């Protein structure tokens, strides 16, 4: 099975690079963007399986990015996880179709579980078959 690709959009370089290291260590391919323009470009060019998006990014902010991505036929099915230090945006995020809203500072294990769950749900919605391991008893 091919590695899943995740687009991380955050203008804080240390956050983005730290997340990239953690995601790569967990077996994901990772691409980075630091503003709204790069986020749109990379989402359309790279076709990620999931987007991790900060709210406070240059060029319009994460909510504008999410809204435009969800309106585009090419990107509307990509799950979006907001990862942000901005409290109070959960309702707006979910109205825009977010899969999750995670506050910074985040617990790495919880974020990884959230990513895994969003990818599993997305895979099921896209029509991919999800196979369960079965054990035969003899």
Language-model features, listed with the residues they occupy:
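Charged docking surfaces used in two-component/phosphorelay signaling
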Residues: 17-25
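CheY-like receiver
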Residues: 123-138
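Active-site beta3 strand of CheY-like receiver
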Residues: 46-52, 57
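Alpha4 helix (beta4-alpha4-beta5 surface) of REC/receiver domains from two-component response regulators
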Residues: 20, 64, 86-103, 110-113
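Hydrophobic/aromatic residues positioned on beta-strands within the core alpha/beta folds
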Residues: 81-83
